[in-house]
């Protein structure tokens, strides 16, 4: 299976996203290290859905011939200043603020689009 | 899910087996603080061998727990950080885990023994405790 939609409604859904993303990365041929990077990134993104957006959806999928994408979509309050959100240590929820900067380093590409109050979409990709 | 806390002489052993929810993390921290003051423990070994993926949230729970234990005068060592967990944490940046780490529980106990002995101060007064 190369597309998986997981709804993040409570804390235990986060671990499911972690498990599934690591398994999919393995099936797609990523090294164990890369699969751990992807799973850690999935954990950060799914946790953000739960903490900052009151839930949302994470989609795990193959991207092109040699990649994997983690995509989150939510209808929470959104991210007013994306550059700030990507800064090391910036958090509006008294967190460590290293989730998004961490995802950026763990993955090869990170795109964030946010229409505050309407929809936030985050895509993180990694290539084989 | 409760995190069991085992006493071994002047040291407490904790093994975190699964990702903790917010509520479970708070409960664990409270339990550990109570046990430290009850037993006047001088050291705490936190084993995370069973944790498969450690994100910044779990890293923070571990760090905060270690700081609390230190405030109560206990030395803290983390053991069992899995190699791939370590790689991912380093890649994420910052010193996400800010506590001394060793490979396994045995080394954790050795390290605690050494640092407790090095303090001399309180360890010496607690001659009722045995390993
Ligand atoms: N899905 C989201 N919806 C709204 N805001 C978000 C979302 N994801 C991240 N953010 C914002 O970006 C900030 C930085 O996120 P992150 O680096 O993961 O740090 P932390 O989660 O520790 O606050 C958050 O504090 C929050 O303001
Ligand atoms: Mg976060």
Question: Model-derived features: where do they sit?
Answer:
Chain A
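Conserved beta-strand-loop-beta-strand hairpin that lines the nucleotide-binding pocket
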Residues: 1-4, 46-128
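Bergerat-fold GHKL ATPase/HATPase_c domain
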Residues: 1-40
């Amino acid at each position: 299976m190369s597309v998986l939609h997981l709804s993040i409604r409570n804390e235990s859904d986060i671990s499911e996203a972690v498990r599934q993303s690591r398994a999919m990365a393995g099936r797609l041929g990523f090294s164990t290290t890369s699969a751990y990077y992807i799973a850690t990134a999935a954990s950060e993104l799914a946790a953000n859905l739960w903490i900052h957006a009151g839930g949302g959806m994470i989609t795990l999928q193959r991207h092109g011939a040699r990649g994997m994408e983690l995509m989150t979509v939510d209808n929470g309050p959104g991210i007013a200043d994306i550059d700030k959100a990507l800064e090391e240590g910036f958090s509006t929820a008294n967190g460590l603020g290293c989730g998004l900067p961490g995802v950026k380093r763990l993955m090869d590409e990170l795109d964030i689009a946010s229409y505050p109050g309407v929809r936030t979409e985050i895509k993180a990709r990694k290539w084989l | 899910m409760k995190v069991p806390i085992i006493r071994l002489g002047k040291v407490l052993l904790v093994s975190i087996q699964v990702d903790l929810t917010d509520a479970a993390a708070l409960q664990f921290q409270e339990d550990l603080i109570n046990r430290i003051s009850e037993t006047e423990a001088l050291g705490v070994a936190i084993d995370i061998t069973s944790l498969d993926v450690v994100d910044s949230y779990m890293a923070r729970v571990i760090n905060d727990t270690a700081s609390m234990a230190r405030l109560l005068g206990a030395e803290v060592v983390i053991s069992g950080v899995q190699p791939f967990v370590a790689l991912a944490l380093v890649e994420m940046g910052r010193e996400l885990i800010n506590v001394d780490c060793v490979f396994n529980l045995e080394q954790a106990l050795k390290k605690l023994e050494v640092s407790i002995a090095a303090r001399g101060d309180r360890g010496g007064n607690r001659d009722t405790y045995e390993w």
